[in-house]
């Protein structure tokens, strides 16, 4: 795979992939607020559907409908995409932070669960991803 294929500076979250389909500004604002909540709550591992819905003063089902309408993803898949994008950013921008600690910061208690989720998303492990992006 080419380095450009994994350049996080040019990647979009799944909900951004269909930017050519204009959405109501309220969807964009809603998604932005959800992303902020997920990132802020990752270290404390309080980024589940119930916690996020509660933080937005929504019921779980209402939250599920809104996030799916705005992104085309289930809440779980959307949360995972935000976690992986943040992990990729930390791996590239914070070279002094251990990979295990990047996983913890992104809400993964288990290093192997983090590695497996990262591989599924990016097609390579976090160490390989970091090395690829820091060999510039």
Show where each model-derived region lies.
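Terminal helix-turn-helix DNA-binding modules in bacterial transcription factors
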Residues: 50, 69-109, 132-136
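Coiled-coil-like amphipathic alpha-helices with heptad-repeat character
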Residues: 59-60, 78, 125
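Basic, amphipathic alpha-helical hairpins
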Residues: 26, 33-47, 67, 71, ...
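…primarily DNA-binding HTH/wHTH and HhH modules…
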Residues: 6-17, 21, 116-136
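Append "Primarily bacterial transcriptional regulators
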Residues: 50-59, 63, 67, 101-109, ...
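Short, Lys/Arg-enriched, Trp-marked, Pro/Gly-tolerant hinge/linker segments that flank
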Residues: 2-33, 56, 69-77, 81
């Amino acid at each position: 795979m080419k380095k450009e294929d994994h350049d996080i500076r040019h990647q979009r979250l799944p909900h951004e992939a269909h930017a050519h389909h204009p959405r109501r500004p309220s969807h964009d604002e809603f998604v932005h607020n959800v992303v902020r909540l997920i990132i802020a709550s990752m270290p404390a591992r309080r980024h589940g559907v119930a916690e996020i819905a509660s933080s937005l003063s929504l019921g779980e089902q209402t939250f599920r409908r809104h996030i799916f309408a705005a992104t085309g993803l289930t809440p779980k898949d959307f949360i995972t995409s935000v976690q992986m994008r943040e992990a990729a950013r930390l791996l590239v921008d914070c070279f002094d932070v251990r990979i295990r600690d990047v996983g913890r910061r992104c809400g993964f208690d288990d290093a192997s669960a983090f590695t497996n989720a990262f591989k599924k998303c990016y097609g390579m492990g976090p160490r390989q991803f970091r090395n690829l992006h820091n060999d510039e």
